[in-house]
């Protein structure tokens, strides 16, 4: 799981200020961090089906947030996906 220091680092990097935890960019970045952690976890624990289900749920949640962000603010969306390395 992402610890408190990593969350603060993500919030300070992608948020407008230190306490900006609810903006779409921060939410997408936090979900991406959790997805990366679960992906590594599932490489060693292949039979952990509940974590796999949680991973798929997070991917769907991130996809819907990305779709919303793309419609809302295209330029910020492009900056975010380039920072996170999500698309080519």
From Swiss-Prot:
Any GO MF annotation of the entry: structural constituent of ribosome
Pfam assignment, any one: Ribosomal_S15
Any one GO CC term of the record: cytosolic small ribosomal subunit
GO biological process: translation
Keywords annotated in UniProt: Ribonucleoprotein, Ribosomal protein, RNA-binding, rRNA-binding
Keyword match RNA-binding: yes
Function: One of the primary rRNA binding proteins, it binds directly to 16S rRNA where it helps nucleate assembly of the platform of the 30S subunit by binding and bridging several RNA helices of the 16S rRNA.
Quaternary structure (record): Part of the 30S ribosomal subunit. Forms a bridge to the 50S subunit in the 70S ribosome, contacting the 23S rRNA.
Protein family per UniProt: Belongs to the universal ribosomal protein uS15 family.
Name by which UniProt lists this protein: Small ribosomal subunit protein uS15
Species for this entry: Borrelia garinii subsp. bavariensis (strain ATCC BAA-2496 / DSM 23469 / PBi)
